[in-house]
Amino acid sequence: MDSATRNPNYSPEVDPQPLPSTNPIHSRPIFSFPKRPALRITTEFDSESTVFFHKISCKFLDSLAKLKFAFHNNSKGEIAEPQISFVSKYLSLHYDLEDHSALVKSSVDVGPKLKLIGTHDVKAQQGEVTMVANLDDPGYALQLSTPLPSIALPKATFKFPQGEISLQEINDHDEDEQVKNSLSVSGTLKGQLLKGLCTAQYKDQEFKLRYRYKDDEMSFLPILSLPSNALSFAFKRRFGPSDKLSYWYNCDSNYWSAVYKHTYGEDFKFKAGYDSEVRLGWASLWVGDEGGKAKTAPMKMKVQFMLQVPQDDIKSSVLMFRVKKRWDI
């Protein structure tokens, strides 16, 4: 019989364990240096303009703000349009080193449903102040904006789920060079009609009617402008998950254009088309998402090759390319 069975008060001997140190000096290094923020370098090149565009940026303050430096340089190495930017959620500053001009943008949440947005050009001494008030019902908002220095009443825009309406005072000059104030009305109204979306837009005394029908294989978009009675329409047909044909025609000018697109996975795209207005045929190949960023492309690099063939002078065909590369350091 073992000792635990003979003596109910028996407890085995346990080696003593060292107690954890409560002195904070021994729990962290004597000298601690802040972690260097990650640098993001992006370079773009366009063979048509033979100009490089460079951008260097980094985030700091736990990604609450970003510092960016951007500039162009040509084939001779000359630097042009250098700009420094500081961007955060509530304040951004863009400074042009050549023009010595600064653009300041700021936004302040006055309340849970009220926001103030301000923009100021320091060199031009001009700016704009906008107030946005979100109403209790979702999708409804009232926006007031005025330029600084103010020369007219603020522009008022009322937004609702079916569109928006804007009222703005405009200062015109008559034949006697006297200032004449007038009220300008613009707006957009949209709604469902015959399994499609109908949109009516009025701006600058021009009225546009759009109707868009779209399903999994086809989309159709006619556009009518009044009072010019200009009519155009766009048609798109999908032949599978990788092939799509787009066609656009203007009934007044008889100009038309067509584009065929074929995708190879997510990173390769081939497009070919023709534009009758400029009498130009073209074809392009994209490596990387055409509308995406370089960080999602293979090797963080996007490349586009484009061949342009003029109909009237085939011998003057041009092959161009664009490259965009990103480095994370």
Curated annotation (Swiss-Prot):
> Residue spans with biased composition (Polar residues)?
1-10
Q: Which residues lie within the region annotated Disordered?
A: 1-29
What's the superkingdom here?
Answer: Eukaryota
Task: List residues in topological domain: Cytoplasmic.
Answer: 58-60, 98-113, 149-154, 215-216, 237-243, 266-272, 313-329
Q: Report the main location listed first in the record.
A: plastid
Quote the subcellular location field of this record: Plastid, Chloroplast outer membrane
Q: Which family does it belong to?
A: Belongs to the plastid outer envelope porin OEP37 (TC 1.B.47) family.
Summarize subunit and interaction data from the UniProt record for this chain.
Answer: Forms an hourglass-shaped multimeric complex.
Name by which UniProt lists this protein: Outer envelope pore protein 37, chloroplastic
Per the record, the gene is OEP37
